[in-house]
A protein has these predicted regions:
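Phosphate-handling catalytic cores of nucleic-acid transaction enzymes
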Residues: 1-232
Length: 232
Protein backbone atom coordinates (compact mmCIF):
# COMPACT_ATOMS: atom_id res chain seq x y z
CA UNK A 1 0.00 0.00 0.00
CA UNK A 2 2.90 2.37 0.73
CA UNK A 3 4.43 1.65 -2.67
CA UNK A 4 1.08 2.38 -4.37
CA UNK A 5 0.68 5.67 -2.55
CA UNK A 6 4.21 6.80 -3.37
CA UNK A 7 3.91 5.67 -7.00
CA UNK A 8 0.64 7.56 -7.50
CA UNK A 9 2.30 10.72 -6.19
CA UNK A 10 5.14 10.36 -8.68
CA UNK A 11 2.91 10.00 -11.76
CA UNK A 12 -0.28 11.89 -10.88
CA UNK A 13 0.93 15.04 -12.65
CA UNK A 14 1.62 13.11 -15.86
CA UNK A 15 -1.57 11.24 -16.71
CA UNK A 16 -5.31 10.76 -16.25
CA UNK A 17 -7.24 7.50 -16.15
CA UNK A 18 -10.38 6.98 -18.26
CA UNK A 19 -12.95 4.28 -17.50
CA UNK A 20 -14.85 5.52 -20.55
CA UNK A 21 -14.91 8.72 -22.61
CA UNK A 22 -17.10 10.49 -20.04
CA UNK A 23 -15.47 9.23 -16.85
CA UNK A 24 -11.96 10.64 -16.70
CA UNK A 25 -10.09 11.37 -13.49
CA UNK A 26 -6.69 11.62 -11.83
CA UNK A 27 -4.54 8.64 -10.93
CA UNK A 28 -4.09 10.04 -7.42
CA UNK A 29 -4.80 7.66 -4.54
CA UNK A 30 -5.98 8.04 -0.96
CA UNK A 31 -4.56 5.11 1.03
CA UNK A 32 -5.18 4.28 4.69
CA UNK A 33 -3.24 1.46 6.36
CA UNK A 34 -4.43 0.35 9.79
CA UNK A 35 -1.49 -1.06 11.73
CA UNK A 36 -0.43 -1.65 15.30
CA UNK A 37 2.37 0.33 16.87
CA UNK A 38 5.68 -1.41 16.18
CA UNK A 39 4.86 -2.57 12.64
CA UNK A 40 7.72 -0.47 11.19
CA UNK A 41 5.42 2.03 9.50
CA UNK A 42 7.94 4.87 9.58
CA UNK A 43 10.79 2.70 8.33
CA UNK A 44 8.79 1.40 5.38
CA UNK A 45 7.65 4.86 4.35
CA UNK A 46 11.16 6.29 4.68
CA UNK A 47 12.56 3.60 2.40
CA UNK A 48 9.78 3.80 -0.19
CA UNK A 49 9.72 7.60 -0.36
CA UNK A 50 13.43 8.16 -0.99
CA UNK A 51 12.68 9.39 -4.52
CA UNK A 52 10.30 12.07 -3.21
CA UNK A 53 12.81 13.23 -0.60
CA UNK A 54 15.55 13.40 -3.23
CA UNK A 55 13.32 15.51 -5.48
CA UNK A 56 12.63 17.86 -2.57
CA UNK A 57 16.37 18.20 -1.97
CA UNK A 58 16.87 19.07 -5.63
CA UNK A 59 14.13 21.71 -5.44
CA UNK A 60 15.70 23.12 -2.28
CA UNK A 61 19.10 23.38 -4.01
CA UNK A 62 17.52 25.12 -7.00
CA UNK A 63 15.69 27.50 -4.69
CA UNK A 64 18.89 28.25 -2.76
CA UNK A 65 20.72 28.92 -6.02
CA UNK A 66 18.00 31.28 -7.19
CA UNK A 67 18.03 33.15 -3.90
CA UNK A 68 21.79 33.63 -4.22
CA UNK A 69 21.79 34.66 -7.86
CA UNK A 70 18.47 36.51 -8.16
CA UNK A 71 18.86 36.39 -11.91
CA UNK A 72 17.91 34.30 -14.91
CA UNK A 73 14.40 33.23 -15.85
CA UNK A 74 11.92 33.77 -13.04
CA UNK A 75 9.51 31.01 -12.10
CA UNK A 76 6.71 31.05 -9.56
CA UNK A 77 8.38 28.20 -7.66
CA UNK A 78 11.54 30.10 -6.81
CA UNK A 79 10.05 33.55 -6.20
CA UNK A 80 8.56 32.15 -2.98
CA UNK A 81 9.97 33.00 0.45
CA UNK A 82 10.36 29.30 1.25
CA UNK A 83 11.46 26.30 -0.85
CA UNK A 84 8.68 24.41 -2.69
CA UNK A 85 7.60 21.07 -1.20
CA UNK A 86 6.05 17.84 -2.44
CA UNK A 87 5.57 16.03 0.87
CA UNK A 88 3.37 17.39 3.67
CA UNK A 89 3.09 15.63 7.03
CA UNK A 90 1.57 18.30 9.27
CA UNK A 91 -0.37 21.16 7.71
CA UNK A 92 -3.74 22.84 8.03
CA UNK A 93 -6.09 22.61 5.07
CA UNK A 94 -5.64 26.33 4.44
CA UNK A 95 -1.87 25.99 4.60
CA UNK A 96 -1.87 22.98 2.29
CA UNK A 97 -4.11 24.76 -0.23
CA UNK A 98 -1.86 27.82 -0.26
CA UNK A 99 1.24 25.65 -0.74
CA UNK A 100 -0.38 23.92 -3.72
CA UNK A 101 -1.50 27.23 -5.23
CA UNK A 102 1.90 28.92 -4.98
CA UNK A 103 4.24 25.94 -5.24
CA UNK A 104 4.23 22.38 -6.55
CA UNK A 105 0.76 21.48 -7.83
CA UNK A 106 1.25 17.74 -7.41
CA UNK A 107 1.79 16.79 -3.77
CA UNK A 108 1.49 14.05 -1.15
CA UNK A 109 -0.10 14.38 2.27
CA UNK A 110 1.41 11.61 4.33
CA UNK A 111 1.88 10.43 7.87
CA UNK A 112 3.17 7.21 9.38
CA UNK A 113 1.42 8.27 12.59
CA UNK A 114 -2.26 8.83 11.85
CA UNK A 115 -2.68 11.12 14.83
CA UNK A 116 -0.69 13.77 12.99
CA UNK A 117 -3.39 13.90 10.31
CA UNK A 118 -6.53 13.02 12.23
CA UNK A 119 -5.49 15.15 15.20
CA UNK A 120 -4.37 18.07 13.07
CA UNK A 121 -4.98 19.57 9.60
CA UNK A 122 -8.23 21.07 10.92
CA UNK A 123 -9.82 17.63 11.31
CA UNK A 124 -11.60 18.51 14.52
CA UNK A 125 -14.42 20.70 15.74
CA UNK A 126 -15.93 23.37 13.52
CA UNK A 127 -13.13 23.08 10.95
CA UNK A 128 -13.84 19.41 10.24
CA UNK A 129 -16.60 19.83 7.64
CA UNK A 130 -14.53 22.31 5.63
CA UNK A 131 -11.47 20.06 5.79
CA UNK A 132 -13.40 17.02 4.58
CA UNK A 133 -15.03 19.01 1.78
CA UNK A 134 -11.60 20.22 0.64
CA UNK A 135 -10.10 16.72 0.67
CA UNK A 136 -13.13 15.21 -1.08
CA UNK A 137 -12.75 17.68 -3.95
CA UNK A 138 -8.97 17.23 -4.01
CA UNK A 139 -9.41 13.46 -4.42
CA UNK A 140 -11.04 14.13 -7.78
CA UNK A 141 -8.81 17.14 -8.58
CA UNK A 142 -11.91 19.33 -8.67
CA UNK A 143 -11.32 23.06 -8.99
CA UNK A 144 -12.11 24.84 -5.74
CA UNK A 145 -11.72 28.17 -4.01
CA UNK A 146 -11.28 28.88 -0.32
CA UNK A 147 -12.11 32.19 1.33
CA UNK A 148 -11.74 32.50 5.07
CA UNK A 149 -12.07 35.46 7.40
CA UNK A 150 -8.68 37.03 8.06
CA UNK A 151 -7.09 34.72 5.47
CA UNK A 152 -5.95 35.14 1.88
CA UNK A 153 -8.32 33.66 -0.71
CA UNK A 154 -7.04 30.57 -2.50
CA UNK A 155 -8.06 29.13 -5.87
CA UNK A 156 -6.93 25.67 -6.95
CA UNK A 157 -7.10 24.25 -10.45
CA UNK A 158 -5.02 21.71 -12.38
CA UNK A 159 -3.56 20.23 -9.20
CA UNK A 160 -3.14 16.73 -7.78
CA UNK A 161 -3.18 15.41 -4.21
CA UNK A 162 -2.49 11.89 -2.97
CA UNK A 163 -2.88 10.81 0.68
CA UNK A 164 -0.89 8.05 2.33
CA UNK A 165 -1.76 7.53 5.97
CA UNK A 166 -0.77 4.77 8.39
CA UNK A 167 -2.56 4.73 11.71
CA UNK A 168 -3.34 2.63 14.74
CA UNK A 169 -6.88 1.29 14.87
CA UNK A 170 -7.50 3.07 18.18
CA UNK A 171 -6.62 6.46 16.67
CA UNK A 172 -9.09 6.03 13.82
CA UNK A 173 -11.84 4.68 16.08
CA UNK A 174 -11.46 7.60 18.49
CA UNK A 175 -11.55 10.11 15.62
CA UNK A 176 -14.64 8.51 14.08
CA UNK A 177 -16.46 8.39 17.42
CA UNK A 178 -15.98 12.14 17.85
CA UNK A 179 -17.10 13.36 14.44
CA UNK A 180 -20.64 11.95 14.64
CA UNK A 181 -20.41 10.00 11.41
CA UNK A 182 -19.58 13.10 9.36
CA UNK A 183 -16.63 11.45 7.61
CA UNK A 184 -18.75 8.50 6.53
CA UNK A 185 -21.76 10.62 5.65
CA UNK A 186 -19.70 12.90 3.40
CA UNK A 187 -18.07 9.93 1.69
CA UNK A 188 -14.58 10.75 2.96
CA UNK A 189 -13.65 7.21 3.97
CA UNK A 190 -15.16 5.79 0.77
CA UNK A 191 -12.42 7.56 -1.18
CA UNK A 192 -9.69 5.58 0.56
CA UNK A 193 -8.14 2.24 -0.27
CA UNK A 194 -8.11 0.73 3.23
CA UNK A 195 -5.54 -1.89 4.16
CA UNK A 196 -5.65 -3.86 7.43
CA UNK A 197 -2.77 -6.38 7.26
CA UNK A 198 -2.20 -9.08 9.85
CA UNK A 199 0.27 -8.14 12.55
CA UNK A 200 3.78 -9.57 12.29
CA UNK A 201 4.79 -8.51 15.81
CA UNK A 202 6.29 -11.48 17.61
CA UNK A 203 6.69 -13.45 14.38
CA UNK A 204 9.41 -11.51 12.61
CA UNK A 205 12.61 -13.52 12.46
CA UNK A 206 15.82 -11.54 12.23
CA UNK A 207 17.51 -11.61 8.86
CA UNK A 208 20.79 -9.98 8.05
CA UNK A 209 20.40 -6.91 5.85
CA UNK A 210 21.15 -7.67 2.18
CA UNK A 211 24.26 -6.24 0.57
CA UNK A 212 22.12 -4.63 -2.14
CA UNK A 213 18.49 -3.52 -2.46
CA UNK A 214 18.22 -3.72 -6.23
CA UNK A 215 14.42 -3.68 -6.50
CA UNK A 216 14.04 -0.80 -4.04
CA UNK A 217 16.77 1.15 -5.83
CA UNK A 218 15.00 0.66 -9.17
CA UNK A 219 11.71 1.82 -7.64
CA UNK A 220 13.37 4.95 -6.24
CA UNK A 221 15.06 5.64 -9.58
CA UNK A 222 11.76 5.38 -11.46
CA UNK A 223 9.99 7.61 -8.93
CA UNK A 224 12.64 10.30 -9.26
CA UNK A 225 12.58 10.05 -13.04
CA UNK A 226 8.83 10.67 -13.13
CA UNK A 227 8.99 13.50 -10.61
CA UNK A 228 11.56 15.28 -12.75
CA UNK A 229 9.07 15.34 -15.63
CA UNK A 230 7.68 18.71 -14.62
CA UNK A 231 4.10 19.22 -15.65
CA UNK A 232 2.86 20.82 -12.47
Amino acid sequence: STALGVASTCVQHLALVARDHQTVGPVSLFVLSVLRSGERKSTIFRKMSEGIWEMQRELKEQWDHYQEEKQGKLTHLFERDIPPKILFEDATVQGLAKEIETGIRSVLMSSSEGGTVFGGIGMRGEALMGALAFLNKAWDAEAQSMTRKQAVSTYLEFYRLSCLISSQRETIQEWLSKNAGLAEGMGFLARFLICVPESTIGYRIYKQAPDATTKLDRFTEQCLKRLRQKRY
